[in-house]
């Protein structure tokens, strides 16, 4: 982890155009003292990997609400490794379509290499707390990095 505030790269993966949740999570992370690089909606795996490498990210947070996260996230960890990124990875949202129970979905994403997996019903505070735990972060003051920087 970097010597300064912990850095996260955040975005909505694949063709998913939902951006409200990541914008709210962006604000919650900043309030908790994280430096956030919000890639926005419809972000390719390669963009996550490049941004994580460029910003020396401590964590990569991936959102998906349209139910196709498994397809969109396939190979993400390979892309991160190829870019030299060794960061905590978190995925959350409505990750699968149909009647699949969340524990089954969670197991699939953990098998893909994600450190934390959250359902769409998870509150922002729980995600922030989990990222803090993963990164062993103490309370810090908020940063002033601009949205999308």
Curated annotation (Swiss-Prot):
Is Cell inner membrane there in the keyword field? Answer: no
Q: Which cofactor does it need?
A: adenosylcob(III)alamin
Role noted for this protein: Catalyzes the carbon skeleton rearrangement of L-glutamate to L-threo-3-methylaspartate ((2S,3S)-3-methylaspartate).
Gene responsible for this protein: glmS
Q: Which GO terms describe its molecular function?
A: cobalamin binding; metal ion binding; methylaspartate mutase activity
Q: What is this protein called?
A: Glutamate mutase sigma subunit
Organism equals Halobacterium salinarum (strain ATCC 700922 / JCM 11081 / NRC-1)
Organism classification: Archaea, Methanobacteriati, Methanobacteriota, Stenosarchaea group, Halobacteria
Give the multimer and partner information: Heterotetramer composed of 2 epsilon subunits (GlmE) and 2 sigma subunits (GlmS). GlmE exists as a homodimer and GlmS as a monomer.
Under CDD domains, the record lists: Glm_B12_BD
Q: What GO terms in the biological process aspect are recorded for it? A: anaerobic glutamate catabolic process; glutamate catabolic process via L-citramalate
**Its family?**
Belongs to the methylaspartate mutase GlmS subunit family.
Recorded catalytic activity of this chain's protein: (2S,3S)-3-methyl-L-aspartate = L-glutamate
Q: Which NCBIfam families match?
A: MthylAspMutase, PRK02261.1
Q: Which domain of life is it from?
A: Archaea
| Keywords assigned | Cobalamin, Cobalt, Isomerase, Metal-binding
Gene3D superfamilies given for it? Cobalamin-binding domain
